[in-house]
């Protein structure tokens, strides 16, 4: 006897409202997982994303693409004219939601650099697949392509997901390898700087001697620490154990020596030798270690960069010039130089003082035409008077500089003759006391400079008022003698010193 057949109900097709409800639930889940929200930090992704999570993310991306296709096919063309006021708001809300999804998808599709990276990696994979029948990309291949572009962390994740969707096998630790490369990407630049400075064909202009080259060669063992290691060592700085503190300081110093060299190289040709710049940068590094607060979560190399730059800049301001210029004025000179270069490129000619003053902020910032001329005069480097000039190098720069204080020969002869006549008048017309006071007040030999009433009073022990009366009487006698002999005492008036 055959068993009765079971009645299986044929599944009914879902209505449009049911489909829309499922879509809204799925979108709510995506929002909760922050797919449509802010991108997660790249670092956290490395240690949180598992294989199952990546699979779920691929499904989410595929779902978003499906929604985008449905939107393009289902949404009817907009009717011309105004929409009736009684039109349902649900359609409007759906359009906004689709616009959000569209923006989320376009954020990746409209990035040219992201598409270039994907195409380059696919080309590398195709070449390897043809030669070795290899269906995978190595960490080195991926890093070599990413190093040519500056992509944010979320774009890198998108690139890796696209490669997996295309069936390309990636190493299991690719995210961690990329993160390590991005954390230490400055090291390659610093290594190139050190290699350039340690080459045998280095020019004398860089002022690198054998001792500095030996120091640069020893930096191969100086490796920058990652963030976790910096935090662990920085905590030891607060230790009460002196040996532990010394160890932590030594680790932070040795791991950042290449950073000091890289910054010092950018300040060459500013008046200090390269070894002096390195030494000042090391002092700034030690200052940064003493001020560093690990609890704020900052990377030490980023924090130390500003202290190193400040130490080098102050050293250049204090030591590079024969006549010291204040640090704030050095910064103003650098600002003016940058403004002048910018205007030169913009206008195609040398900017005027008025244009420079306006570029620097004008009257509101205190920059006038006179102030600009003053700053330019301060920025000039001093030149030695003994510097040789000319092709023969027998002449000196001082030979061509005019001495404004020197007298012409005829002026000197006339002045000497007048002094001899005045000396004779003083001896013949005045008493010893009057002659002494007049000589001190006018500055005649043996007194080579004029003296005030107070100085004369202290010298000869006579009150100021009495000295003034004696001087007035003596000058009256001399004027009478001059009138009688038809002489001139005009040159004496310039030598008198006001009280």
Swiss-Prot record:
<dbReference type="GO" id="GO:0016987">
    <property type="term" value="F:sigma factor activity"/>
</dbReference>
<feature type="region of interest" description="Disordered">
    <location>
        <begin position="68"/>
        <end position="89"/>
    </location>
</feature>
<dbReference type="InterPro" id="IPR014284">
    <property type="entry name" value="RNA_pol_sigma-70_dom"/>
</dbReference>
<dbReference type="InterPro" id="IPR028630">
    <property type="entry name" value="Sigma70_RpoD"/>
</dbReference>
<feature type="region of interest" description="Sigma-70 factor domain-4">
    <location>
        <begin position="425"/>
        <end position="480"/>
    </location>
</feature>
<keyword id="KW-0238">DNA-binding</keyword>
<keyword id="KW-0731">Sigma factor</keyword>
<feature type="compositionally biased region" description="Basic residues">
    <location>
        <begin position="1"/>
        <end position="12"/>
    </location>
</feature>
<dbReference type="InterPro" id="IPR000943">
    <property type="entry name" value="RNA_pol_sigma70"/>
</dbReference>
<feature type="region of interest" description="Disordered">
    <location>
        <begin position="1"/>
        <end position="25"/>
    </location>
</feature>
<dbReference type="InterPro" id="IPR050239">
    <property type="entry name" value="Sigma-70_RNA_pol_init_factors"/>
</dbReference>
<feature type="compositionally biased region" description="Basic residues">
    <location>
        <begin position="77"/>
        <end position="87"/>
    </location>
</feature>
<dbReference type="InterPro" id="IPR013325">
    <property type="entry name" value="RNA_pol_sigma_r2"/>
</dbReference>
<feature type="DNA-binding region" description="H-T-H motif">
    <location>
        <begin position="453"/>
        <end position="472"/>
    </location>
</feature>
<comment type="similarity">
    <text>Belongs to the sigma-70 factor family. RpoD/SigA subfamily.</text>
</comment>
<keyword id="KW-0804">Transcription</keyword>
<dbReference type="InterPro" id="IPR007630">
    <property type="entry name" value="RNA_pol_sigma70_r4"/>
</dbReference>
<dbReference type="InterPro" id="IPR007624">
    <property type="entry name" value="RNA_pol_sigma70_r3"/>
</dbReference>
<keyword id="KW-0805">Transcription regulation</keyword>
<dbReference type="GO" id="GO:0005737">
    <property type="term" value="C:cytoplasm"/>
</dbReference>
<feature type="region of interest" description="Sigma-70 factor domain-2">
    <location>
        <begin position="252"/>
        <end position="322"/>
    </location>
</feature>
<feature type="short sequence motif" description="Interaction with polymerase core subunit RpoC">
    <location>
        <begin position="276"/>
        <end position="279"/>
    </location>
</feature>
<dbReference type="InterPro" id="IPR007627">
    <property type="entry name" value="RNA_pol_sigma70_r2"/>
</dbReference>
<dbReference type="GO" id="GO:0006352">
    <property type="term" value="P:DNA-templated transcription initiation"/>
</dbReference>
<protein>
    <recommendedName>
        <fullName>RNA polymerase sigma factor SigA</fullName>
    </recommendedName>
</protein>
<dbReference type="InterPro" id="IPR013324">
    <property type="entry name" value="RNA_pol_sigma_r3/r4-like"/>
</dbReference>
<dbReference type="Pfam" id="PF04542">
    <property type="entry name" value="Sigma70_r2"/>
</dbReference>
<keyword id="KW-0963">Cytoplasm</keyword>
<dbReference type="InterPro" id="IPR012760">
    <property type="entry name" value="RNA_pol_sigma_RpoD_C"/>
</dbReference>
<dbReference type="InterPro" id="IPR036388">
    <property type="entry name" value="WH-like_DNA-bd_sf"/>
</dbReference>
<comment type="subunit">
    <text>Interacts transiently with the RNA polymerase catalytic core.</text>
</comment>
<dbReference type="GO" id="GO:0003677">
    <property type="term" value="F:DNA binding"/>
</dbReference>
<comment type="function">
    <text>Sigma factors are initiation factors that promote the attachment of RNA polymerase to specific initiation sites and are then released. This sigma factor is the primary sigma factor during exponential growth.</text>
</comment>
<feature type="region of interest" description="Sigma-70 factor domain-3">
    <location>
        <begin position="331"/>
        <end position="412"/>
    </location>
</feature>
<dbReference type="Pfam" id="PF04539">
    <property type="entry name" value="Sigma70_r3"/>
</dbReference>
<dbReference type="Pfam" id="PF04545">
    <property type="entry name" value="Sigma70_r4"/>
</dbReference>
